[in-house]
Structure formats: C-alpha cells, structure tokens
Amino acid sequence: MQKSKAGVFAVAALGLAMTLNTAYAAEYKASTKEGPVKIVNLNDLESQVKANMDKGAFGYIRGGAEDEKNMRDNTASFDRKYIMPRVMQGIELKDIDLSTSFLGIPLATPVIQAPMAAQGLAHRDGEIATAKGMAKAGSVFSLSTYGNKTIEEVAAVSDGHPFFFQLYMSKNNAFNEFTLKRAKESGAKAIILTVDSPVGGWREGDLRNNFQFPLGFANLELFAAQNNDGSKTGKGAGISEIYAQAKQAFTPDDIQYVKKLSGLPVIVKGIQSPEDADRVIEAGADAIWVSNHGGRQLDSGPASFDVLPSIAKVVNKRVPIVFDSGVRRGSHVFKALASGADVVAVGRPVLYGLNLGGAEGVNSVIQQLNKELRINMMLGGTKDINAVKQTRLYSDRDFQ
C-alpha cells in the first residue's frame, strides 16, 4: 500500500531532523539528566540550574528585558491579592479535583506549559522530553517555531496526547504556509499566534554574554533545506537576528489568515490590554493568552497578573483565557484562575525541571504546582476548578 504524501513528508522530516541533530550534538553540551526532581519550592531550581549550565544559555533562559522590573513584578504582583481562608466546608483533601478542559481538551490539571524556544539548551532531548513530561502530567505541550525539534518529532512521541504549535509568523508567507500545513498534518490541536514580539526586548544579559544560539531551530532548518532563501536558522545567530525575520506589522487579518491555512483554533498570545483583547476576539480568535512574555519584552509594562481582571471583564467568557508570566506557586495558579483565567501556563520552571531531570523533571514541576494548588484549594474552601474560578480575591483596600 502506497504511503500518503503527508506520511512520506513526515518520515523525510524526521530523517533530516536526525541528521541536523547529529551535526550539532557534539558542539554544545546540554544536560542528559533523567529522573524525578525533589522540589520544595520552584524558586530553588534556578540556582541549581545556574551552577551547571553554560553561562550564556542560562542567561538567555533566565533573563528579562532592561532592568528586569517587569519580570520581577510579574511574580510580586500575586502578593497584592489574598485568598480568604474558609472553614467547615465539608471537603476532604482526597476529593479536591484539579481536572478541567480547554478548547474541548480534557486536562488533569489547569497548569499547562508555555511555549519556549531552544529547549535543547536545557537538555539534550529538548522539546521531546518536555512533550513527554507534559503528557505524563496529563496536560498540554506547546512547541515553539524556534524549537530545536521539529513538529514531526514532537508528534511522534506525543502518542495521542494533545500538543499546540506556537507560530512566530515570518515575513515570508511561504514559510508560514509550509509550517502551518505541517502542524495540521502532524496533529496539533491549536495554533498559538504570538503577537507581542515584533522586535525582541532589550535583553542586556544576552548582550553582555554575546549570546548566540549554539543549536539550530529545527523547523527553520527544515524549511531552509528545501527553500534556499538565505534566512537565519538559529545556529550562530542572536535573538534580535531571528526576530528581524519575523513579521512585525501584525493586523487582525492575520488571525483569519492563520485559521484558513491551518484549519485549527487560533490562540492569540501576548494580550496585555482590554482593547487588544476585544479587537482580536472580534477578528476571530478562538482564545486569548494574557502574557507579557515573562518580562522579556517591554520592561515598563504592567505585571501580567495586574491586567488580567480587566481583560477578563471585557472578554466576558466569549473565549477562553490562558494566563502566564511570573507563576511560581500553586497559590499563583489559584489567584489567576480566580481572576478570569481558564488555564495557567508556566515557562522558566519547566525548563529548569527539564535541565535537572528530563521528562521526569518536567513532570515534577507540574506536580509541585498541583500539590500546592490542592492545599490552597482546601484552605480556601474550593473543591474543584469551577469553584476556584468563582472565588473572590481580596486586596489591602478590603481591610481598611
């Protein structure tokens, strides 16, 4: 029986990816650690990773824009809201239910993984290990356009578990069409359209370290192997050179363009204002992703959590909301859900878990957040995620 065209391409893509991986594997020494990671506090992981990772690579993963005020405030902002302790609610800890759904996909936890580039910096198996770890956690993996593994490689190890593809639109529509077609054929459940990075933020750590990616971006390499257009493919380039190839002049029409090409739901990522939320929903977004890129873009912008309630009010449940930026605690997950998010994404801690334990390390990070979330739900008198979403949070003004 003759193989389908898509099947033949997938096999070819996997073969090329293996060739490319072999070419650079000896040049950059990434972690090969495998196994569960003992975690008391996610904040402890950063120093452990720093001690063992290449300085430039660690700086790229950890760093934020300019003075990193926005990055720090993302986490600090959660302390401006309180969960009111509730008692005598008749709830057993064993009955706390973290399950939920997003875009019709059942999830064991409301915690998902934020798409992040170049995961091969953290671990030899990169995005493949992260995909396996998120699958084990019963959650969703999201692959970046700038990942070190191809869409086909991730699909091959997903084993039916859901994954999303994050698109950094190129100025070259041939690349967009090539990539979205592959995402659809490989089984991606949604496209994350990132719109908050028309240029890279001023990341001083990368500049001081003269950081250039030691590994190629597999999806860019795959396109370049078939279309010699002279584009940078990651290896030997800085982030500003990569972003320079990406589309800058976004318009709402791009949402329909991506939907038409992919035939998949489109999640618009990087929303920070109620006005933009309303605009992209009117343009056809199937979900919005409230995020300031983890403090890596506009340092003078507000904390992501601070803008979430006003955005949720405008969205008014027309589409689901994903939230990220600064999440380090189960209480942060609780507060984001209570402020209008439907699911909550985590970035850097996932990469730290990946570095320290591969797929099992990724799962360890999600399970730590789940443990803390269960305790916060129990003490806050909420039995399930819907109850969390109905919870009122308090601020200092309420006690004056």
What is each stretch, according to the model?
Residues M1-A10:
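Bacterial N-terminal signal peptides that target proteins for export
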Residues A10-T19:
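Bacterial N-terminal signal peptides
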Residues A23-A25:
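Boundary at the C-terminal end of the N-terminal hydrophobic targeting segment
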Residues E27-L103, R203, N210-F250, N386-V388, ...:
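An N-cap/entry alpha-helix motif that binds or orients negatively charged groups
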Residues N74, S304-I311, L354-R374:
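C-terminal helical cap(s) of enzyme catalytic domains, especially alpha/beta-barrels
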Residues P106-K149:
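Glycine-rich active-site/cofactor-binding loop and its immediate structural neighborhood
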Residues A118, K132, V157, A174-F323, ...:
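Alpha/beta enzyme core
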Residues K136-V157, H161-N176:
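A gly/proline- and charged-residue-enriched helix-loop-helix capping module
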